């Protein structure tokens, strides 16, 4: 079952989601992801934020957990950076996403085959209506979500009319 959570901005939807996902009984049984897409303006941005949120959430759970995600993504890159003291640090992140829909397909493939069920909250979900680069993103996401039997979604938004239009069309 999926849920839409709609209220004005700055009311506490995001804090509520984080609080729910921090509950021990949720953390034990599910992989949880909160994806804030407010600052996204394209499908590519959305896919980048989505993939990064999944990777960042899985990384502390151990190598075997996040390796499962890394193995399905083709748009990965290794990165070397330097901390404030000049010490090099190595990491893995999302690289250039040349085909956002293919990468989205890979992310949903992982979610559907993860070792535990997944709870995914997409915050400011109405933002997808503003993506000019792919008018079909709503239909694509609807299809992915309907076929993703290992995950449940919370669609959080602050614009009632846009959220209503998404879920009634």
Please report, for each region that a protein language model flagged, where it lies by residue:
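Conserved Walker B catalytic segment
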Residues: 2, 90-160, 168
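P-loop NTPase nucleotide-binding core
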Residues: 2-3, 7-11, 15-119
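Short, aromatic/basic amphipathic alpha-helical patches
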Residues: 21, 167-169
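Catalytic NTP-binding/metal-coordinating core of nucleotidyl cyclase/transferase enzymes
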Residues: 163
């Amino acid at each position: 079952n999926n849920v839409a959570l709609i209220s004005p901005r700055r009311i506490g939807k995001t804090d509520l989601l984080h609080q729910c996902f921090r509950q021990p009984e949720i953390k034990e049984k599910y992989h949880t992801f909160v994806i804030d897409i407010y600052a996204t303006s394209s499908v590519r941005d959305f896919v980048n934020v989505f993939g990064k949120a999944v990777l960042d959430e899985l990384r502390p759970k151990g190598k075997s957990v996040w390796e499962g995600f890394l193995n399905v993504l083709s748009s990965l890159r290794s990165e070397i950076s330097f901390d404030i003291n000049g010490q090099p640090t190595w990491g893995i992140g999302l690289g250039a996403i040349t085909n956002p829909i293919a990468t989205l397909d890979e992310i949903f493939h992982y979610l559907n085959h993860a070792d535990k069920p997944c709870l995914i909250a997409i915050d400011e979900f109405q933002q997808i209506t503003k993506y000019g680069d792919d008018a079909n993103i709503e239909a694509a996401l609807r299809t992915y979500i309907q076929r993703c039997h290992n995950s449940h979604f919370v669609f959080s938004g602050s614009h009632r009319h846009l959220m209503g239009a998404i879920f009634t069309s």
